[in-house]
Amino acid sequence: WVEGCKGHHDDYIFWAICKDDESEDIIGWASLANINKVNKSASTHSIVIGDRDYNDGFTWIETVRFMFEYAFETLKLNRLYGVSLVGHPMSNIIGDLMFMAKEGVLRQAIFKNGRFYDLLYNAILRDEYYIHKENGDYEMRKIIKRLRNLRHG
């Protein structure tokens, strides 16, 4: 699978998520998909953290911050969107923390584990990203403060 992800692809990019230590062991992966150069958009297709010791949210936040920066600053995209299962705790919270606007729900759009699930679409635009970046909203201390506010209210 990893070998198939290597190389040049016009419409998707995969990254390994590694430990921030001397080992640099792979703990997961992330990808941008559906990269459209005409519409200047892409999907935060997936974030998978396989090591439970790093599945506490901070690795997710760091990964999303990296994906935002890469999408808007390197690829010069105008729109970045994500799709997640309604009720998926990590995806839904991360979308709120990173100022992704809820665009809509596709009802019973996916069949998984013997039942249908709704899908939530979130997105952020280039100008919104830069406003929040300039305000320092993507600094970890501000993200943690927003997380506390979400949990308490």
Q: Model-found features: residue ranges?
A:
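Acyl-donor (CoA/ACP) binding surface of acyl/acetyltransferases
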Residues: 18-153
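Active-site rim helix/loop that mediates acceptor-substrate recognition in acyltransferases
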Residues: 1-11, 19
